[in-house]
Amino acid sequence: MMIYASLAVIAVAFVLFFVIQQKKLKSSETFSKSAMGFFNNLDGFTMSYALFGIKGPSGHTRAMAIDTERELICLYDANEKKKHHMLDYSVLASSEVFENEISISFFSDDSKILKLNFEKELSEDSKRVFNLSVECKFVSDEIPSFKIYTIHSNNPVDNNEYLFKKEETNKWHHLMVKIIDYNNQPVKHID
């Protein structure tokens, strides 16, 4: 009798877990459509990568799009739909969004898996080192392409100096950018 009761409890727990996960997924899909529409209608910004479900320090869900051509990152807050934050690559380090290591996977409508990894650490000379990797994986076997962008910084360099290193194979494309002036660059607030 006790065995049946235990099995029933396990079954109920499993069903509840499944229902909660489905609700979370549906909520993420709704948010992704809203954010994607927002990014697509943003003047002077062309998405290279989007979008990421990020929990900010306030607990709000945010989305992120990267414009690699203009070297801009746009952060979109679900609770502040009329306001967004535009970041240059150079201010990643001072952004409150990236205070902790982040590793996020997001499933978008067009069968892409988007993953963001952000890490920061102290180097030997106490200069901060920042790494941002963005991976875009196409689920379809017809398009077996992967892309990763890594942005890193050791020492700030001149305002206009960016260091690029590109490496291409049939599956991977790497872009490394030196983040500049990460202590002085202000975050642009755009209403």
Where are these regions (language model features)?
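Anionic N-terminal interaction surfaces
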Residues: 3-79
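A short, sequence-level motif marking secondary-structure junctions
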Residues: 79-81, 89-93, 151-156
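Short, surface-exposed beta-strand/loop "edge" segments at domain boundaries and coil↔beta transitions
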Residues: 72-74, 80-83, 141-149
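Phosphoinositide-dependent membrane-docking surfaces
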Residues: 86-102
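Short, well-structured alpha-helical interface segments that form or flank functional binding sites
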Residues: 84-87, 167
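Core residues of folded domains in eukaryotic genome-function proteins
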Residues: 69, 83-85, 132
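Short, surface-exposed charged micro-motifs
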Residues: 63-65, 84, 94
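Acidic, Ser/Thr- and proline-rich intrinsically disordered linker/docking segments
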Residues: 97-191
